[in-house]
C-alpha cells in the first residue's frame, strides 16, 4: 500500500502500534521499539499480524472459490461470493480482518510490511544483542514468505512497499526467496520446526509457480507428523477464527458440493469423509431462507487453522510425481485419517484428478482452494452467468483485482491499469 494508507492501517491493525497505544498518554515514539531488547516482541507482532490476515484470507478465499456460500444480508459481502469484486470496492481493500465483511488487501499488506521491517532490523543486530537472533530472523522471514503467498494467490496483482505493480507469479517468486532466506536462518539456528515450515512454504510457492520438480524436492523434506498452525482466541475479535466467525454469525455456509462427501471402500460401499465433515444446524442463514451448514473443522472461535502440514507436503509430491506414488499417498493419507485406502488406478488423468480432489478435501478451508482453481483451470462452481441467490449473476473472477486505493496512491503504478 502507499504510505498514506499504510500509516493509517498500521495504527489500526498492527500489533506493535496496538502495544504503543495502550501506553498512552506517554506517547512513546515507535522508533523506541527499534531496539534489540524488543526483538521477541517484534517477531510476536509479526505473527499476530499474519494470523489476522490469514484468517481473512481463508474466509474470503472460501467465498471466492467453491467452499463457502454467502448466506447473509450484507450487500458489501456478496461480490466475494458472486466473483465480481470491483477495484473501487472499499471492503476488500481497506476493511479490517475482523470486519463483518473481512478485508484482505490491507491486513495482508500490513502483515507483510511488519514481517519485512522486523526481518530487516534483525539483520542489523548481532547475536550478542539478541539471544536466539537466527531463530527470530527465520520466523520473520518465513512469515514474510507466507504473507506473499497470500498476496500472490488471492490477488491478480499486488505492490510491495510502493513499488511497481507485480503479477501473481512475481509476488510468488518473492515468496520463494523469503522461504529460502528463512530456511538458511532456521538451519543456522538448528530449529527443525522452522526448517520444516520453510521447506513447506517454499514447496507451496514453487508449486504455485509451476515448478513441480522444485516443489517435489522441498515437500520431501517435510517430516511425518509435521503441522504448523495459526492460533486463534475467542476473547479477541481480531484473533477469533475467522471461518468460525462467519458460521457463528450465520453469514456463510458450506457449499452443496462439499456436503455429504464419502470415500469408497474396497467392497464397493462408501463411508463419510471425516476430513470434511459438515453439520446441519437446523437453522437458516441470516438471509432467513438458505440452510446453514457449518464445517466441523472449526466449531469454536479458538480453533487453529493449519498453515502447513505433512499432509499438504505429501499431496504436493503426489501432484508432482503422479503414478503409483500418488496412488500410495492418497491411500496412506486416507488411512491416517481413519478412512479406507482403496483407491486404485493406472490412468494418469484419473490419478491427477483424484489428487486434485484429495487436495480439496484434505486442505478444506485452509486457503488453498481458490488458487488451485486458478492455477489448474478448474471449472468454477456455480458457472459464470448462473443467477446469484442475492441478485445478479456469477462472474468469472478467479482472483481479486488490485484495489484502487493502491493504484491511486502508489506513484509507481500506472493509473489506467494498463
Each predicted region: which residue ranges?
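Membrane-proximal, proline-rich intrinsically disordered regions
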Residues: 13-65, 381-418
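Conserved, well-structured interaction surfaces
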Residues: 40, 46, 77-154, 181-189, ...
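"A position-specific structural signal for the A-helix of alpha-solenoid helical repeats
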Residues: 136, 143, 150, 194, ...
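Hydrophobic-face positions in mid-chain alpha helices that act as interaction patches
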Residues: 84, 176, 210-211, 216-311, ...
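Short coil/turn linking the two alpha-helices of tandem helical-hairpin repeats
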Residues: 150-160, 208-212, 325
Amino acid at each position: 500500500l502507499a504510505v498514506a494508507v499504510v500509516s493509517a492501517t498500521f495504527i489500526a491493525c498492527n500489533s506493535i502500534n496496538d502495544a504503543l497505544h495502550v501506553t498512552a498518554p506517554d506517547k512513546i515514539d515507535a522508533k523506541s521499539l527499534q531496539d534489540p531488547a524488543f526483538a521477541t516482541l517484534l517477531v510476536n507482532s509479526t505473527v499476530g499480524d499474519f494470523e489476522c490476515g490469514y484468517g481473512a484470507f481463508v474466509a474470503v478465499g472460501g467465498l471466492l472459490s467453491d467452499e463457502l456460500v454467502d448466506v447473509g444480508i450484507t450487500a458489501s459481502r456478496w461480490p466475494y461470493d458472486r466473483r465480481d469484486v470491483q477495484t473501487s470496492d472499499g471492503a476488500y481493500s481497506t476493511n479490517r480482518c475482523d470486519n463483518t465483511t473481512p478485508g484482505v488487501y490491507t491486513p495482508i499488506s500490513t502483515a507483510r510490511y511488519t514481517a519485512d521491517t522486523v526481518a530487516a532490523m534483525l539483520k542489523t543486530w548481532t547475536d550478542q544483542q539478541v539471544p536466539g537472533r537466527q531463530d527470530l530472523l527465520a520466523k520473520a522471514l518465513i512469515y514474510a514468505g507466507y504473507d506473499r503467498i497470500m498476496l500472490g494467490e488471492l490477488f491478480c496483482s499486488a505492490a510491495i512497499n510502493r513499488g511497481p505493480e507485480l503479477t501473481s507469479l512475481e509476488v510468488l517468486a518473492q515468496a520463494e526467496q523469503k522461504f529460502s532466506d528463512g530456511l538458511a536462518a532456521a538451519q543456522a539456528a538448528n530449529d527443525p520446526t522452522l526448517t520444516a515450515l520453510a521447506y513447506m512454504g517454499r514447496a507451496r510457492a514453487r508449486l504455485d509457480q509451476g515448478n513441480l520438480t522444485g516443489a517435489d524436492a522441498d515437500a520431501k523434506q517435510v517430516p511425518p507428523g509435521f503441522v504448523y498452525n495459526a492460533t486463534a482466541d475467542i476473547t479477541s475479535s481480531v484473533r477469533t477464527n475467522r471461518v468460525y466467525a462467519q458460521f457463528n454469525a450465520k453469514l456463510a455456509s458450506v457449499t452443496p458440493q462439499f456436503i455429504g462427501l464419502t470415500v469408497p471402500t474396497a467392497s464397493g460401499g462408501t463411508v463419510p469423509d471425516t476430513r470434511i465433515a459438515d453439520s446441519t444446524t437446523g437453522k437458516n442463514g441470516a438471509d432467513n431462507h438458505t440452510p446453514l451448514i457449518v464445517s466441523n473443522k472449526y466449531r469454536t472461535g479458538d480453533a487453529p487453522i493449519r498453515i502447513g502440514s505433512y499432509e499438504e507436503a505429501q499431496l504436493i509430491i503426489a501432484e508432482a510425481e503422479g503414478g503409483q506414488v500418488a496412488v500410495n499417498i492418497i491411500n496412506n493419507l486416507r488411512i491416517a485419517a481413519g478412512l479406507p485406502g482403496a483407491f486404485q488406478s493406472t490412468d494418469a488423468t484419473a490419478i491427477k484428478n483424484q489428487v486434485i480432489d484429495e487436495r480439496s478435501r484434505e486442505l478444506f478451508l485452509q486457503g488453498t482452494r481458490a488458487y488451485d482453481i486458478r492455477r489448474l483451470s478448474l471449472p468454477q462452481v456455480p458457472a459464470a452467468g448462473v443467477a446469484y441467490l442475492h441478485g445478479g449473476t456469477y462472474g468469472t473472477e478467479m482472483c481479486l483485482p488490485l484495489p484502487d486505493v493502491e493504484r491511486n496512491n502508489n506513484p509507481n503504478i500506472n493509473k489506467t491499469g494498463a
